[in-house]
């Protein structure tokens, strides 16, 4: 693999399995500039179309889900590894759903179910975008619902 810093060839110096063997993490060292970097390998197993609320269809995009979760978890005590694991769990649920098309609501509910127990602030942030709260009253209802379940 080419070095992202100088485009020289690299060598693997460490390999580890993550996410119960679903992901392989490799530490690499460039043979030219001697800098180190990390790569990840994972099987692209989720091959479904997401049906949006407006009826549009688009291919499932892991990176899009990761971006949304990173925004929700911004400045919260949630590591990148935890977010990655959450997305892997959601993908496992999508595979179990066993359909060629999945409503975006299924993905959103899977994420919110996991975020609720992980971090309440990140949950509310994600829910505010996912559920498109139109006013403060709707947001208040979501917060009150969260507080009742404690």
UniProtKB/Swiss-Prot annotation:
UniProt keywords, alphabetically: ATP-binding, DNA-binding, Metal-binding, Nucleotide-binding, Repressor, Transcription, Transcription regulation, Zinc, Zinc-finger
GO molecular-function term, one example from the UniProt record: ATP binding
GO biological process: negative regulation of DNA-templated transcription
Domain of life per record: Bacteria
The keyword NADP belongs to this UniProt entry's keyword annotation: no
Domain ATP-cone: 48-138
NCBIfam families, per database record: transcriptional regulator NrdR
Function recorded in the entry: Negatively regulates transcription of bacterial ribonucleotide reductase nrd genes and operons by binding to NrdR-boxes.
Descriptive protein name: Transcriptional repressor NrdR
Phylogenetic lineage: Bacteria, Bacillati, Chloroflexota, Chloroflexia, Herpetosiphonales
């Amino acid at each position: 693999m080419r070095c992202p810093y100088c485009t020289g060839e690299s060598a693997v110096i460490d390999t580890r399995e993550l996410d119960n063997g679903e992901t392989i993490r490799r530490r690499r060292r460039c043979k030219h500039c001697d800098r180190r970097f990390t790569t990840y390998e994972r099987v692209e197993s989720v091959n479904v179309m997401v049906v949006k609320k407006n009826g549009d269809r688009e291919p499932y995009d892991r990176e899009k889900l990761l971006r949304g979760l990173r925004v929700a978890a911004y400045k919260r005590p949630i590591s990148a590894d935890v977010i990655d694991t959450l997305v892997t769990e959601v993908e496992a649920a999508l595979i179990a759903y066993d359909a060629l098309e999945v409503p975006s609501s299924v993905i959103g509910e899977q994420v919110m179910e996991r975020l609720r127990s992980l971090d309440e602030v990140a949950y509310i942030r994600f829910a505010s975008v996912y559920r498109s709260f139109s006013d403060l009253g709707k947001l208040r209802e979501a917060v009150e619902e969260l507080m009742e379940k404690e």
